[in-house]
Amino acid sequence: MTIQSTANHQDGYLPAILCLHGAGTNATIFNLQARTIVRCLKHKFRFIFVNAPFESLPGPGVIPTFAEIRPYLRWHCDENAIQEFDVSPELVDNERRLVRSMISDKIEQEATGPSLGIVGVMAFSQGTRVATGLCLDPEFGSSIQFAIIIAGTFPALSLENPVSDSETTNLFSGINGNKHEQLQIPSVHVQGTMDPWGPESARLLKECWSADLAMVVKFHGAHQVPTSKKDAQAVAQAVLSCWDSAQT
């Protein structure tokens, strides 16, 4: 797994945030997209950008801005791909297993270092589905103390194997529509006011994350990471508030 870190040697003791890019991009592109947010928080956290393992077509808006930054990558398929694209259940499970192993290795590697390890996750678009699945994971979810969900999409992508993503969704919907307990960690949900996937972002928040522990940051934009200094500072302020809440 290709890994990029924003930290220098002196920052090695800072707690880390695992950064998961959207489909059709990569770690380098997400690092560039999130650079203003990272700049606002680099004194508090290390940001670890990781590449998804599977090649894909470029995502929306990637061309022409990032035409030279290849390959374009994606996370694992969900069960919908079995019917829509004639993908075998075995392939879906194998992809899920590989993503879980990659993320597991990185969490364990950071846990043996001098810092607090990976304490949070920041994700964009398809990466938010993986991030939510990570927080749900019974083995690794407890290490994630807060989440930054940028332009979220739905549903969560489970990291357990074999578990269908519809079953992941059903964790939050009982018989007769009764709701089970949602993720009880602080979260920041960053949403562009013109994002065509806005309803999916709202559904991810409603069904998977505790509203009492969630902060929503709106910005003028579409399906993108906010880049203006004003918007980045608003996100950073919310993140620091979440971090404070997670430690109390």
From Swiss-Prot:
The keyword Hydrolase applies. Keywords: Hydrolase. GO terms for molecular function: hydrolase activity. The active site is at S125, D195, H223. It comes from the Eukaryota. Its EC number is 3.1.2.-. The keyword Hydrolase applies. It is an enzyme of class 3 (hydrolase). Induction: Expression is positively regulated by the fusarielin biosynthesis cluster-specific transcription factor FSL7, probably via its binding at the 5'-CGGNNNCCG-3' motif present in the promoter of all the cluster genes. Disruption phenotype: Abolishes the production of fusarielins F, G and H. Signal peptide: none annotated. Pathway: Secondary metabolite biosynthesis. One of its GO terms (biological process) is secondary metabolite biosynthetic process. GO terms for cellular component: cytoplasm; nucleus. InterPro entries: AB_hydrolase_fold, FSH-like_dom, LovG. Belongs to the LovG family. Thioesterase; part of the gene cluster that mediates the biosynthesis of fusarielins F, G and H, decaketide compounds with 5 methylations and a decaline core that act as mycoestrogens as they stimulate growth of MCF-7 breast cancer cells. The initial compound in the pathway is produced by the reducing polyketide synthase FSL1. FSL1 lacks an active enoyl reductase (ER) domain and biosynthesis of fusarielins relies on the trans-acting enoyl reductase FSL5, before it is released through hydrolysis catalyzed by the thioesterase FSL2. This is Thioesterase FSL2. The gene is FSL2.
